[in-house]
From Swiss-Prot:
PANTHER family in UniProt: CHOLINE TRANSPORTER-LIKE (SLC FAMILY 44), CHOLINE TRANSPORTER-LIKE PROTEIN 2
Catalysed reaction, written as an equation: ethanolamine(out) + n H(+)(in) = ethanolamine(in) + n H(+)(out)
Name recorded for this polypeptide: Choline transporter-like protein 2
Subunit structure, as described in the record: Interacts with COCH.
Chain segments annotated as transmembrane: 34-54, 233-253, 257-277, 316-336, 365-385, 458-480, 505-525, 564-584, 600-620, 639-659
Keywords: Antiport, Cell membrane, Glycoprotein, Membrane, Mitochondrion, Mitochondrion outer membrane, Phosphoprotein, Transmembrane, Transmembrane helix, Transport
Entry keyword annotation includes Lipid metabolism: no
Glycosylation sites recorded in the entry for this protein: 187, 200, 417
Keyword Hydrolase tagged: no
Single Gene Ontology BP annotation: ethanolamine transport
Superkingdom field: Eukaryota
Naturally occurring in which organism (per UniProt): Homo sapiens
Length: 706
């Protein structure tokens, strides 16, 4: 290695020279990347202005309440429709028109009603009976029965027929049900359309599907919501258990790092082994059972995931996946056993550092709070922007009309030329839009909103990384630990980051935000091109998405190490990124093995916590723990709380381990700098711990003499 060093250094910069005044993070530093700091402040001012404009023009009621043909809200308090929460379609069959997909509005009159119709009636029959008072509530407001039947139906004052309906998403849909495989409304398989002819119930089904294309998705969402309402208490208990396990693991790492790492490795192997055994037992148990040999391909997608657990092929797939993971982990442990010892020494050192800076374990809460603020501002601004359009009215006509889909004014339409040429046409509320400059810029404002979210979120993450790196670097470069540590290393690092390096953090976050917004645009274009048959375009899009994904991962890695250099030396972003990159390239073998081995060990720790809590949740929610068998709530889909607990447990474990991860990365870079700066002599002693020196066969001469 020593023979290669001069040539290797020439390609990737020169090693750090010994500096007798260097004692860790530099305190006398200046502001860096001031221009980027100014740009960030201006962008935040612009972002606030966009939010104010959106909140001024936006109206979230458009998302919550349905609107009638006049653009008035149904069920909103303080309006004339306060007691009319449901939207009623005069002729829902019209919703099957392709115009719905273009205008997002059914070409039929719509009014707000107190309740959906519960009986079958035609206007022709109800007009001359006592049912007319009931029927009239489904006519346009202010309707007076002083017209002929044909004129009333032609003007769209009343629906031709009422069909028993049920409310769904505040809209009235036909109460269609199946009896012995036959679709029916009430006791009928056909209905009279009010014009003297009878139509099939399937016409209503098509109209209802187009009027609410997410019917099945909403039903699935409602079942999932029901599961959450009865299981949220147990989900929280599961997450608390995950938090307690993570905290206990971190505390044990502080005192028993080496033992805990080996216990963690063995436990992961045992957990995977038990998973393989359980899958095999289930696979064997299903042998010979009726329907268990159906293939996953033949079964297709099912919303009830319990169906898959009755198939042998499902458990075979699980067993193969777990076996592959088990073999990979065992092989990695065999070939990397020597490097694992050094990685354990780094983790031990990180445990000591975290022990001296215990408040660092609470810093993820600060990052979480700031990220929640970013998400809340972005989401609220997006909602207000999307609802800041004005009511647009368009011409609808069942018969051919040259003015169909043209904009109109409902107040002047009755006396307009369009009304005279198309007597059956109606000027009806179509959607929310607008023709002003602000409305034309809405798409751009939404993109700006998303871009600022990425920029600010990455800035918050960068601030956390620089803060933790500064605190842990103070620990490493303290020759006499903990005597040479500053009083409040975390708060000092946080203050330095905000005071001197806001611009550098903004620069790194900006680069990452640009790549991320490009990835979002590529995803949007990919969705638009899915229907296209151009194979070249699809291939190009896939390549671009892959390249930008790799670029984002590389930039995140480079930024992380650049922030460590910023925390230590106080240099600007570009200089820090270059120095960090060259330092890592000069020690590429150690980076590829040591740093990644520690990441792998932390991943095993997360898997141990997530796997343990996930298995416990699985046995609890599937009523397999006899002691609490009657306590577990009945569920539509038991995978809902299980997946929630698993994902939540991973996020909690990741939050705790991220502090350790940043500590290890910081100590690793400091360790590499230490090897380049110092040689172990009395004048240039190593700052690394005695354990690391022993593993690397390094000694401080002064210590050896004593």
């Amino acid at each position: 290695m020593g023979d290669e060093r001069p040539h290797y250094y020439g390609k990737h910069g020169t090693p750090q020279k010994y500096d007798p005044t260097f004692k860790g993070p530099i305190y006398n530093r200046g502001c860096t990347d001031i221009i980027c700091c100014v740009f960030l402040l201006l962008a935040i001012v612009g972002y606030v202005a966009v939010g104010i404009i959106a909140w001024t023009h936006g109206d979230p009621r458009k998302v919550i309440y349905p609107t009638d043909s006049r653009g008035e809200f149904c069920g909103q308090k303080g309006t004339k429709n306060e007691n009319k929460p449901y939207l009623f379609y005069f002729n829902i069959v019209k919703c099957a028109s392709p115009l719905v997909l273009l205008e997002f509005q059914c070409p039929t009159p719509q009014i707000c009603v107190e309740k959906c119709p519960d009986r079958y009636l035609t206007y022709l029959n109800a007009r001359s009976s006592r049912d007319f008072e009931y029927y009239k509530q489904f006519c346009v407001p202010g309707f007076k029965n002083n017209k002929g039947v044909a004129e009333v139906l032609q003007d769209g004052d009343c629906p031709a027929v009422l069909i028993p309906s049920k409310p769904l998403a505040r809209r009235c849909f036909p109460a269609i049900h199946a009896y012995k495989g036959v679709l029916m409304v009430g006791n009928e398989t056909t209905y009279e359309d009010g014009h003297g002819s009878r139509k099939n119930i399937t016409d209503l089904v098509e109209g209802a599907k187009k009027a609410n294309g997410v019917l099945e998705a909403r039903q699935l969402a409602m079942r999932i919501f029901e599961d959450y309402t009865v299981s949220w208490y147990w989900i929280i208990i599961g997450l608390v258990i995950a938090m307690a396990m993570s905290l206990l693991f971190i505390i044990l790492l502080r005192f028993l790092a080496g033992i805990m790492v080996w216990v963690m490795i063995i436990m992961v192997i045992l957990v995977l082994g038990y998973g393989i055994f359980h899958c095999y037992m289930e696979y064997s148990r299903l042998r010979g059972e009726a329907g268990s040999d159906v293939s996953l391909v033949d079964l297709g997608f099912q919303t009830d995931f319990r169906v898959y657990l009755h198939l042998r092929q499902t458990w075979l797939a699980f067993m193969i996946i777990l076996s592959i993971l088990e073999v990979i982990i065992i092989l990695l442990l065999i070939f990397l056993r020597k490097r694992i010892l050094i990685a354990i020494a780094l983790i031990k050192e990180a445990s000591r550092a975290v022990g001296y800076v215990m408040c660092s374990l609470l810093y993820p809460l600060v990052t979480f709070f700031l990220l929640c603020l970013c998400i809340a501002y972005w989401a609220s601004t997006a909602v207000f922007l999307s609802t800041s359009n004005e009511a647009v009215y368009k011409i609808f006509d069942d018969s051919p009309c040259p003015f169909t889909a043209k904009t109109c004014n409902p107040e002047t339409f009755p006396s307009s030329n369009e009304s005279r040429q198309c007597p059956n046409a109606r000027c009806q509320f179509a959607f929310y839009g607008g023709e002003s400059g602000y409305h034309r810029a809405l798409l751009g404002l939404q993109i700006f909103n998303a871009f600022m979210f990425f920029w600010l979120a990455n800035f918050v993450l960068a601030l956390g990384q620089v803060t933790l790196a500064g605190a842990f670097a103070s620990y490493y470069w303290a020759l006499r630990k903990p005597d040479d540590l500053p009083a409040f290393p975390l708060f000092s690092a946080f203050g330095r980051a905000l005071r001197y390096h806001t611009g550098s953090l903004a620069f790194g976050a900006l680069i990452l935000a640009i790549v991320q917004i490009i990835r979002v645009i590529l995803e949007y274009l990919d969705q638009r091109l899915k229907a296209a048959e151009n194979k070249f375009a699809k291939c190009l899009m896939t390549c671009l998405k892959c390249c930008f994904w790799c670029l984002e991962k590389f930039i995140k890695f480079l930024n992380r190490n650049a922030y460590i250099m910023i925390a230590i030396y106080g240099t600007n972003f570009c200089t820090s990124a270059r120095n960090a990159f060259f330092l890592l390239m000069r020690n590429i073998i150690r980076v590829a093995v040591l740093d990644k081995v520690t990441d792998f060990l932390f991943l095993l720790g997360k898997l141990l916590i997530v796997g343990s809590v996930g298995i416990l949740a699985f046995f609890f929610f599937t009523h397999r723990i006899r002691i609490v068998q009657d306590t577990a709530p009945p569920l539509n889909y038991y995978w809902v709380p299980i997946l929630t607990v698993i994902v939540g447990s991973y996020l909690i474990a990741h939050g705790f381990f991220s502090v350790y991860g940043m500590c290890v990365d910081t100590l690793f870079l400091c360790f590499l700098e230490d090897l380049e700066r110092n040689d172990g002599s009395a004048e240039r002693p190593y700052f690394m711990s005695s354990t690391l020196k022993k593993l690397l066969n390094k000694t401080n001469k002064k210590a050896a003499e004593s």
